[in-house]
């Protein structure tokens, strides 16, 4: 569901060839698989995948993932991986019923040792991940997250067209809900992705 260049990063500068700036990081919503493709050879040189054993276990269970990317150089958390873990249920023998969860989360982690650096979810916000958690933060499909220059994170909870900004402590400091539906007679709406862009990209707007 998502693919992007890694771009310049500290891991490659330190000699780790897996993170060559021209390599491509991808994710698969249907298999909950994160991987990096060597642009020259086509080989998979890094991955996080079911059944989430070894170092991957610290990140499990990841289900229905979207928007996996490396935080660009110059931003807080640069070099870490940021993704939207949608949650829900996933088909296949690699997933047990106990791994299903009706809540979403944003995960930031170090790609070298796969340790979790930051998370935003109903659980981290001290909200029960039951029915209350479902209402609090859950998008079982689409969605994305973006690290901002101020250290906050912009989150697109796409299934309900909710876009909001949270601090590293999880405080919501800005929120927008799109009023636009699929059609005049339908109240449901979705936002596939949402990004913050620099003011200079839209010079006609006032700061």
Regions found by a protein language model. Give the residues of each.
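Histidine-/acidic-rich catalytic cores in large beta-rich domains
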Residues: 1-207
């Amino acid at each position: 569901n998502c693919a992007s260049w890694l771009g310049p990063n500290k891991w490659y500068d330190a000699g780790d060839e897996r993170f060559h700036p021209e390599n491509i990081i991808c994710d698969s919503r249907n298999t909950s698989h994160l991987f990096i493709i060597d642009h020259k050879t086509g080989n998979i040189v890094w991955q996080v995948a079911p059944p989430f054993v070894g170092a991957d276990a610290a990140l499990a269970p990841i289900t229905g993932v979207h928007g996996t990317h490396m935080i660009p150089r110059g931003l807080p958390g640069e070099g870490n991986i940021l993704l939207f873990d949608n949650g829900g249920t996933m088909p296949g023998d690699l997933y047990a019923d106990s791994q299903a969860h009706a809540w979403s989360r944003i995960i930031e982690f170090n790609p070298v040792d796969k340790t979790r650096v930051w998370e935003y979810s109903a659980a981290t916000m001290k909200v029960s991940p039951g029915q209350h958690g479902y209402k609090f933060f859950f998008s079982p499909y689409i969605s994305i997250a973006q690290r901002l220059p101020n250290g906050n994170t912009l989150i697109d909870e796409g299934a309900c067209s909710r876009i909001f900004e949270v601090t590293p402590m999880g405080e919501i400091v800005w929120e927008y809900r799109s009023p636009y539906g699929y059609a005049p007679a339908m109240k449901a709406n979705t936002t596939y992705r949402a990004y913050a862009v620099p003011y200079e990209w839209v010079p006609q707007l006032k700061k």
